[in-house]
Amino acid sequence: MFLSALFIIYFLFNTIKPQINHFKAHFNYVEGLDIGSDVKLAGIPIGKVTNLEINNGLIAVTGLINNEFAIPKDSIASIRSDGLFGKKSLLINPGFDNFFDSSNKNITFIETIDSYSIDMFLRYLKNINE
């Protein structure tokens, strides 16, 4: 009886647990994006950034996303802030192409848009005035 109950609990836990896909995107500039930052699809949180590393002169951003959400293959990954000075998140702007195969556990975004900060903008304005 005890083993049956244990098996049922184990089965329920493993079937309820969301399935996860890994993603990778490359950027030139990721200021403010951190490990643990949200990954959003059209503004809805669907995952987290798990690693940032420099790879061949670019910053490779990797993370986990819930595969319950269908992501078109031509989606664009960008880095955005919540408000003017808010924390950064990776935003997936959905495209219109076929969806990534949900059985494929690795998604690579071909097109990305870099993050630009207020600090960069102020430096740009300072250079114009000089």
Give residue ranges: language-model regions.
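Short beta-strand/strand-turn micro-motif
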Residues: 28-60
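Extracytoplasmic/periplasmic terminal helices and flexible tails
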Residues: 1-28, 34, 60-62, 66-68, ...
